[in-house]
UniProtKB/Swiss-Prot annotation:
GO cellular component terms, semicolon-separated: extracellular space
Top-level taxon of the source organism: Eukaryota
PTM comment text: Palmitoleoylation is required for efficient binding to frizzled receptors. Depalmitoleoylation leads to Wnt signaling pathway inhibition.
Main location, first listed in the record: secreted
Bridged cysteine pairs (disulfide): 89-104
Biological classification of the source: Eukaryota, Metazoa, Echinodermata, Eleutherozoa, Asterozoa
Keywords, in A-Z order: Developmental protein, Disulfide bond, Extracellular matrix, Glycoprotein, Lipoprotein, Secreted, Wnt signaling pathway
Protein function: Ligand for members of the frizzled family of seven transmembrane receptors. Probable developmental protein. May be a signaling molecule which affects the development of discrete regions of tissues. Is likely to signal over only few cell diameters.
Protein name: Protein Wnt-7
Keyword DNA-binding (UniProt): no
Amino acid sequence: SGSCTTKTCWTTLPPFRLVGNILKQKYEKPVQVEPVRARRTRRPAFLKIKDIKNFKKPRPTDMVYLQRSPNYCDRDPRVGSLGTVGRQCNRTSIGTDSCDLMCCGRGYNTHQYTRIWQCNCKF
């Protein structure tokens, strides 16, 4: 008949929210590993599970880590963290400046300020 049909296939990513949710689940249950060096070379030959008590061989899609992250709530000059003690936070925020997140469960003091200024109002 002279007509033809064309099919085009491509790979698409899942919705961004789904990717974020899956990454968060993996972040909450990571597996600590340590590199084991090969005898003849200095390169790591494989990764060994660090915590044998909770042994669970990580799957290729699991999140693994080599060392624990520093505690940024406390001052630690070794890693360059000044800590969060004494910093201002936003009591009504749900972001990174929120008091719940920034104060690391230590609690916080609230201060109320009143500011008076002339607004050049005309009646």
